[in-house]
Curated annotation (Swiss-Prot):
This is Thiol:disulfide interchange protein DsbA. Keywords: Disulfide bond, Redox-active center, Signal. Disulfide bonds join C50-C53. SUPFAM superfamilies: Thioredoxin-like. Belongs to the thioredoxin family. DsbA subfamily.
């Protein structure tokens, strides 16, 4: 009898953990227009000027835990936005596009966040570009060529089309399957671990959601 109740409890706990449910309008919302042309499973919009975006990368390390707890092969497409249409943000957007094309994201992401928000060593477009060149060991000629290339322009054009289509109005914004946006601010931040676990649970729930 004792063994029966232990088995029942294990089954019950297993059933509970695999059937977590979240509420539309609370933990997540539908995007304004659903993307229909086979969007990546996860799209993240961020800004190097956004303190909360910095927290997601540095403090919570969300992408690391997505790959660790969901799948190491899960594709995450990341875009740096220019919501203010300012020249400095435009250059940040371009630098990020170059980084993605050249697979240099990990070399520049945290250092540029820190240079802008923590150390305040990146305050102008020239020292932004110089910092990027130092971090990536790229020369200025190559950077100018790549940053003005068709590939980079196409990357930014596609990004801005998505932003307009879904009516992006804030960062950070995590879009799941081109249908849902996570409401980050509703997730309680009692502890780093609590926030990470809840965030990952919501992503997993939306990735598995049928409709």
């Amino acid at each position: 009898m004792k063994n029966f109740w232990m088995l029942f409890l294990i089954i019950l706990l297993g059933f509970d953990s695999s059937n977590k449910s979240f509420i539309e309008g609370k933990e997540y919302s539908k995007v304004y227009n659903k993307m229909s042309d086979r969007p990546p499973p996860i799209i993240e919009f961020f800004s190097f000027l956004c303190p909360y975006c910095y927290d997601l990368e540095k403090k919570y390390n969300i992408n690391h835990y997505i790959h660790k707890k969901i799948s190491k092969n899960l594709i995450i497409t990341k875009y740096c936005v220019n919501l203010s249409n300012g020249e400095f943000e435009k250059q940040l957007q371009k630098i990020w596009a170059v980084s993605v094309i050249k697979k240099l994201e990990k070399k520049i992401l945290i250092p540029i966040f820190e240079g802008i928000q923590k150390k305040h060593t990146i305050t102008t477009i020239p020292n932004l570009i110089n910092t990027f060149l130092k971090l990536t060991k790229m020369n200025k000629h190559d950077y100018d060529f790549i940053s003005n290339s068709f590939v980079v322009k196409s990357f930014i054009y596609k990004q801005e089309r998505i932003e307009k289509f879904i009516k992006l109005d804030r960062v950070p914004a995590t879009i799941i399957k081109g249908k849902y946006i996570i409401n980050d601010m509703i997730i309680q931040k009692k502890s780093i671990t609590n926030f990470i676990n809840k965030y990952i649970e919501i992503i997993q729930f939306l990735l598995n959601k049928k409709l």
